[in-house]
């Protein structure tokens, strides 16, 4: 089995065929999916999707693009939303200096709020970081000094220094279809160098379809293609990478129940 540790099933791209998307994912062996929150104010819509589909879980949080719109969201607000058994993570939160859709101060404030919630609940924080390696590492190191928290750098596109510092802090690193792109040799070098127990796979669907489906809408079933390239990059079999990334997922997203066949 495989898992898609990060997708956006509430996005309009899936509105007319969500049932079929879930069926295709399960047919491809994807038994667990985490659909990721981008706005706390839309949390109930996200939670409703998880309640429709067994094996689908969600996070709660504010994407850095929207940080300035949800500065009133408190640690207590986030923690309260995690009481549902279907809510298994915080985020995605972090820093996006590529688009800078929110002021950087708002992004950092939101990032630290989500870290505090992850620390309090023990649930993993899904971190979005783009073209913000130095500040991301700085904030993570400062906040870890206040107390450890579980987290994953999702859709990793950073440099080797951010990867090194994240691993040193105990974080995991997740790869999307970007890993499969021809111009991603440097990213594949990083993926090859990471400890086996810290790697995850995700689609970030509907975005970033892997090379085989480039230009098409992405969906959870396509995580298989990412796992294939990760396996090739690390010189192991697809079965081994599937087992490893799945074990890593359940260790990090510990609130997600394991299927009977995956229980250890």
Identify the residue ranges that each predicted region occupies.
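Mid-domain alpha/beta scaffold segments of enzyme catalytic cores
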Residues: 1-264
């Amino acid at each position: 089995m495989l898992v898609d540790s990060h997708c956006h099933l509430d996005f309009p791209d899936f509105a007319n065929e969500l049932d079929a998307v879930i069926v295709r994912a399960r047919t491809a062996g994807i038994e667990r999916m985490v659909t990721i929150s981008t706005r706390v104010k839309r949390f109930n819509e996200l939670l409703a999707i998880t309640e429709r589909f067994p094996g689908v879980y969600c996070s709660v949080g504010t994407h850095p693009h929207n940080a300035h719109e949800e500065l009133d969201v408190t640690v207590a607000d986030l923690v309260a939303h995690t009481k549902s058994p279907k809510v298994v993570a915080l985020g995605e939160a972090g820093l996006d200096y590529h688009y800078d859709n929110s002021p950087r101060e708002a992004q950092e404030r939101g990032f630290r709020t989500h870290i505090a919630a992850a620390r309090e609940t023990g649930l993993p924080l899904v971190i979005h970081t783009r073209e913000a390696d130095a500040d991301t590492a700085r904030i993570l190191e400062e906040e870890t000094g206040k107390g450890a928290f579980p987290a994953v750098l999702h859709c990793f596109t950073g440099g080797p220094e951010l990867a090194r510092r994240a691993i040193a802090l105990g974080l995991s690193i997740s790869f999307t279809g970007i890993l499969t792109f021809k111009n991603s040799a440097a990213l594949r070098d990083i993926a090859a160098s990471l400890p086996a127990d810290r790697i995850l796979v995700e689609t970030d669907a509907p975005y970033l379809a892997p090379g085989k489906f480039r230009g098409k809408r992405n969906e959870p079933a396509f995580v298989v293609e990412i796992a294939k390239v990760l396996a090739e990059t690390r010189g192991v079999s697809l079965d081994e990478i599937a087992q490893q990334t799945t074990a890593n997922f359940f260790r990090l997203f510990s609130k997600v129940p394991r299927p009977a066949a995956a229980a250890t």
